[in-house]
């Protein structure tokens, strides 16, 4: 009798555990959308090209939007297609707030460490995407944004 009770307990535990594992993927999907949106934003390839510019110009950041756009255009259509980019100008516009990104050029950019090089003007829902010259994009609230970009307007 005792053996039968143990088998029943084990069977119930196995069922509950399996149901719990099945529920995990669907229960934690909220952050996945934000992460996917961040990774697919125009800001990521823009920041990667910015970092490549620094790497190919002895640590000097681009002096202007024109200089960065010319550098990106020179990469060629195959390189751009790798980022799903067909129009260089579209890289400079946020798909979330439909405004041009603020990009730090010349003396405003500090190469040599992973530093913020571009960010959304307004963002969405009280958060903004910011990017560093390594191509990392983060979604931050206003307080964290002010810490990371103290001179922002």
Residue positions per predicted region:
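Short loop/turn motifs at secondary-structure junctions and domain boundaries
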Residues: 119-123
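Short, hydrophobic/aromatic-rich segments at coil-to-beta transitions
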Residues: 112-117
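Sec-dependent bacterial lipoprotein signal peptides
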Residues: 1-26
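Conserved hydrophobic/amphipathic alpha-helical signal-anchor segments
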Residues: 27-97, 102-107, 137-153
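Short loop/turn microsegments at loop-to-beta-strand junctions
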Residues: 125-127
